[in-house]
Amino acid sequence: GRAEYVITPRFAPTSSHGQLEMLGALAAEFPDVPIQSHISENLDEIAWVKALFPGCRDYASVYQRYGLLRPRAVYGHGIHLSDAELEMFHASGASLAHCPTSNFFLGSGSLDLRRCVLGDRPVAVGLGTDLGAGTSFSMLQTMNAAYMAAQSHGKPLSAAQAFYLATRGGAEALGIADKVGSVAVGMEADLAVLNLRSTPLLDFRMRYARDLSEALFVQMMLGDDRAVAATYVAGREVYRRAA
């Protein structure tokens, strides 16, 4: 099937030295298995990690020490990563999941997306809803929050960039962009079909959309789960909204 096992330390502060060593050994034994965890969402958490792992220079160094930074390793948040830590992510091939609704809900701050993806040490970033503290599983609402996060750094996020994060960007971060994340011959065709006029407000606003870019921007700012008209998994329809 398409399901995969994932090596998942809850996060460094709740993991013992022995647990992390065992997970690192497992990662070394199975180099193609994804790794998923959490890093640098808030400042108190970072101080906690420093107290628990005094022999490590910073938060990312903890995961690096145990062999848990590598391609297909995805870490949620990363709001407060230093330049040195971003360099470690770049060099190792590890990636970030940007979870803006969680960050806003907890008052943790917001990710400076362009700082992560541009420059001479780019890091792959996908868009995530989070589970415990995320406020919506709608990717449209998550794109809305990502736009606001970018605005808080004075670096606007275009509709094209947001939709990339939610599709191809996520696939790149997970190391599966050869299978999903774009519409092309040979891809596995995991698709969400959007109704651009799914609510009375969207129907009204779309009358004034001048081009595709504006139409997509309207969806990410005003849309929610009601916009999803149908979904396909591996080319097979698995959901269709009732008329």
Predicted regions and their residues:
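Short, acidic/turn-prone active-site loops that include or flank metal/cofactor-
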Residues: 41, 100-104, 131-132
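Conserved protein kinase catalytic core
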Residues: 44, 83, 136, 201, ...
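Conserved, mostly hydrophobic/aromatic
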Residues: 7, 38, 63, 89, ...
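His/Asp/Glu-enriched, well-ordered alpha-helical/loop segment
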Residues: 65-72, 114-204
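C-terminal cap of metal-dependent C-N hydrolases
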Residues: 188-242
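Fold-independent oxyanion-binding glycine-rich loops
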Residues: 10, 39-40, 77-79, 92, ...
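Histidine/acidic residue-rich metal-binding segments in metalloenzymes
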Residues: 1-95, 107-125, 178-181
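Short, flexible, mixed-charge acidic loops at enzyme active sites
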Residues: 51-56, 137-142, 207
